[in-house]
């Protein structure tokens, strides 16, 4: 009897201990489950981000950016509305996440070991690295040992900890944390020659190069690391489970690939000379013709129409080619007659006819193609003819791809010039590799116009002068005085 009593007491004590140990976990789970439930009850997902040319920005048609489109898709998956909250920097972003002001932090955020101890990670969806950048034309450093000036870096990442790790090897390495400037703004300061170096996310570097080609990469400071969304708490919860399912679907269904294609896949095509000439043309020539592009845009974005015109003629209304195409939009004589214009070298007539012809091509694209991709199929037809575009779709289907998926069709365009394929095509040989490059260039040119005006607007809205070196952003925190 005594033994039984002791066993009962011991069992009861074990139950109490187990409850004591499990209760905090239960509370934590309940708290995080309530976050998921709260999102459903309020009917709104709140996502924090940082303004930059890839993640999030306000365009002519409202909110845009990779993180915005992915967040919007996740909100749709949850069946709720989306609210985006833009922060000044990464530090504010993680403070807001810790204070439960936002449900998710999404801003092209690399994996950060220290943050992973405090917050929960969503699935990786692409990768990037930290790069040291300098102004093209200046002496290029080959390693951190050659950095004599203090590096100026933005707040809100684990970059200070990464640099601390290099101090054993490079004891003279120093840096300053910028309190008032974003990573993008520091990159622009490098381009302007106001600061010598900064270290930035490789995706953001490539994006800013599209409007400031003077920015050059010296070397990678780190290997590539995965990019994640960050969620509150570091334990499993319903919100993370929902995000995992959504991300898997987005990856397998091609949503993430399509968004990446839209915002940064064209970055690999960067050419310093071409981009420098283009940015100069945006500044000097585009203002003259922008009202015409806007007037005749129809259902298109005027900046897309402008990008097409630059690809065609470099905004030269008197342009001609040996093949007989002429004018701002480089129209053939037959197209000009079909669109009923008399003078192909008249900028207004050319832009109007080019836009009308492109709208007609879009109407000829099969209805099965998603709305956001129809323009790229139409531009392929604009460049090499509608029949060859349809051949590219048939070939893609024959090769096991999806003829309605632009990413699948795009990669097969060069095959239209290969002898093993074109004899079996309805419309025969075509320089598909040129059509491929044509569309890639237009996407790059369009994004450059968008970001050029966005950067200009941000600069105009800055409540500070920016013309002299005396106006370097202050205050700065020396890494020897305060480490993050």
Swiss-Prot record:
EC numbers listed for it are 4.2.2.n1
List the Pfam families hit by this protein, alphabetically: SBP_bac_3, SLT
Q: In Gene Ontology terms, what is a biological process of this protein?
A: cell wall organization
Q: Where is the signal peptide?
A: 1-18
A GO CC annotation recorded here is: cell outer membrane
Q: Give me the ranges of the annotated region Non-LT domain.
A: 19-267
Region feature Disordered, mapped onto this chain: 459-484
The active-site annotation reads 312
Task: Kindly report, in one word, the top-level EC class recorded for this enzyme.
Answer: lyase
Q: Where in the cell is it found?
A: Cell outer membrane
Give a yes or no for keyword Cell wall biogenesis/degradation in this entry. Answer: yes
Name the HAMAP family for this protein.
MltF (MF_02016)
Task: Please state which protein family the record places this protein in.
Answer: In the N-terminal section; belongs to the bacterial solute-binding protein 3 family. In the C-terminal section; belongs to the transglycosylase Slt family.
Domain description: The N-terminal domain does not have lytic activity and probably modulates enzymatic activity. The C-terminal domain is the catalytic active domain.
The protein's name in its UniProt record: Membrane-bound lytic murein transglycosylase F
Q: What organism is recorded for this protein?
A: Mannheimia succiniciproducens (strain KCTC 0769BP / MBEL55E)
Lineage of source species: Bacteria, Pseudomonadati, Pseudomonadota, Gammaproteobacteria, Pasteurellales
Q: Which gene specifies this protein's sequence?
A: mltF
């Amino acid at each position: 009897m005594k033994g039984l009593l002791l066993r009962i007491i011991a069992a009861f004590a074990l139950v109490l201990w187990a409850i004591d140990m499990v209760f905090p976990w239960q509370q934590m789970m309940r708290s995080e489950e309530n976050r998921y439930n709260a999102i459903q009850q309020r009917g709104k997902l709140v996502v924090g981000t940082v303004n930059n040319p890839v993640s999030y920005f306000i365009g002519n048609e409202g909110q845009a950016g990779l993180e915005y489109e992915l967040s919007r898709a996740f909100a749709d998956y949850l069946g709720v509305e989306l609210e985006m909250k833009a922060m000044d920097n990464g530090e504010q972003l993680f403070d807001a996440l810790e204070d439960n002001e936002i449900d998710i932090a999404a801003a092209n955020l690399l994996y950060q070991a220290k943050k992973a101890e405090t917050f929960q990670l969503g699935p990786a969806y692409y990768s990037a690295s930290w790069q040291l950048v300098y102004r093209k034309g200046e002496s290029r450093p080959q390693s951190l040992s050659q950095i004599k000036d203090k590096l100026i870096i933005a707040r809100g990442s684990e970059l200070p900890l990464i640099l601390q790790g290099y101090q054993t090897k490079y004891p003279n390495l120093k840096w300053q944390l910028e309190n008032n400037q974003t990573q993008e703004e520091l990159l622009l300061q490098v381009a302007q020659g106001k600061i010598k170096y900064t270290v930035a996310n490789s995706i953001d570097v490539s994006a800013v190069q599209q409007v400031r080609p003077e920015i050059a990469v010296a070397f990678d400071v780190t290997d590539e690391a995965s990019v994640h969304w960050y969620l509150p708490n570091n334990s499993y919860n319903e919100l993370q489970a929902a995000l995992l399912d959504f991300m898997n679907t987005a990856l397998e269904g091609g949503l993430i690939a399509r968004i990446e294609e839209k915002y940064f896949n064209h970055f690999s095509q960067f050419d310093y000379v071409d981009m420098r000439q283009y940015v100069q043309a945006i500044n000097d020539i585009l203002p003259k013709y922008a009202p015409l592009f806007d007037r005749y845009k129809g259902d298109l974005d005027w900046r897309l129409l402008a990008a097409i015109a630059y690809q065609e003629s470099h905004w030269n209304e008197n342009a001609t080619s040996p093949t007989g195409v002429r004018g701002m939009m480089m129209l053939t004589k037959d197209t000009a007659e079909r669109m009923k214009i008399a003078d192909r070298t008249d900028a207004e007539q050319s832009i109007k006819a080019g836009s009308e012809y492109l709208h007609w091509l879009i109407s000829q694209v099969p209805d099965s193609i998603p709305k956001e991709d129809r323009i790229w199929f139409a531009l392929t037809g604009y460049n090499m003819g509608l029949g060859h575009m349809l051949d590219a779709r048939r070939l893609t289907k024959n090769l096991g791809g999806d003829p309605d998926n632009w990413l699948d069709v795009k990669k097969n365009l060069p095959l239209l010039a290969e002898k093993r394929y074109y004899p079996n095509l309805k419309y025969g040989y075509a320089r598909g590799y040129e059509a491929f490059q044509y569309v890639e260039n237009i996407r790059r040119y369009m994004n450059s116009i968008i970001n050029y005006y966005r950067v200009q607007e941000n600069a105009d809205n800055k409540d500070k002068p920016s013309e002299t070196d005396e106006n370097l952003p202050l205050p700065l925190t020396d890494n020897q005085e305060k480490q993050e």
